[in-house]
Regions:
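A short beta-strand micro-motif common to beta-rich folds, especially ectodomain repeats
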Residues: 2-10, 122, 164, 168-179
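Surface-exposed binding patches on compact interaction domains or structured appendages
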Residues: 1, 46, 57-63, 101, ...
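Long, low-complexity ectodomains and other extracytoplasmic segments of secretory-pathway proteins
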Residues: 7-130
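Solvent-exposed, conformationally flexible loop/turn segments
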Residues: 1, 111-117, 155-159, 174
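Generic "edge-of-domain/loop-turn" microfeature
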Residues: 11-13, 22-26, 129-131, 141-144, ...
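Short coil/turn segments at secondary-structure boundaries
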Residues: 2, 18-19, 150, 178
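Generic marker of "main functional regions" within proteins
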Residues: 27, 31, 134, 153-155, ...
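Long amphipathic alpha-helical scaffold regions
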Residues: 21, 33-39, 157-164, 169-170
Length: 179
């Protein structure tokens, strides 16, 4: 408690002041983040904002009161340059998040007697929220993919439609196999 004294030509006035300082955690668009569980909820709903917090100097406050090994894990995973993958590995390393796994809708496709170039789509499913990045490579010069690098941001929900072309002009005659 304190008093502010105001002196003027009209007299002297005293204004009592009471200040209370509390630590409400780190404020984000989703509310206060003051522990690892709150951070994980933020990451699940807004990975980018969670990443900004993860790369800030304030992040160590989130780990106060948590397992002491988490701070060591964080320091190891936050060396520059820090990427989304580092944050993902940190979350998995705490045991509080499952790793993202991927599954194809089908593993084989057969085409017979193509008269023209064909465009098709292969659905790719991810198991849970979180960051993933993959590079797509094809075997067979008659196959082309529209996108060679796919990240978790490309998924709609848990599904990504991998579009590919089978180029008729590059098939030639006989059987052709690609991957």
């Amino acid at each position: 408690d304190a008093v502010i004294t105001i002196n003027s030509n009209l007299g002297e006035y005293q204004v009592p002041v009471h200040a209370e300082i509390t630590d409400d955690g780190i404020q984000t668009s989703r509310g206060a983040v003051d522990n690892l569980e709150a951070f994980i909820k933020l990451a699940e709903s807004d990975y980018r904002e969670a990443f900004r917090l993860y790369t800030s100097e304030s992040f160590l406050k989130v780990l106060q009161g948590e397992d002491p090994g988490y701070e060591s894990l964080y320091r190891g995973m936050s060396r520059n340059p820090v990427t989304y993958q580092h944050m993902e590995e940190f979350l998995i390393g705490t045991g509080k998040k499952e790793p993202v796994t991927l599954r194809l809708e089908k593993t084989e496709q057969t085409w017979d007697h193509l008269d023209t170039t064909v465009k098709d789509c292969l659905n790719l499913y991810k198991s849970t929220w979180g960051y993933t990045r993959m590079e797509v490579e094809v075997t067979g010069d008659f196959l082309e993919v529209e996108k060679k690098v796919i990240t978790s941001e490309d998924f709609i929900g848990s599904v990504y439609g991998l579009e590919y072309l089978i180029r008729k002009e590059k098939l030639g005659s006989g059987r052709k196999y690609g991957q």
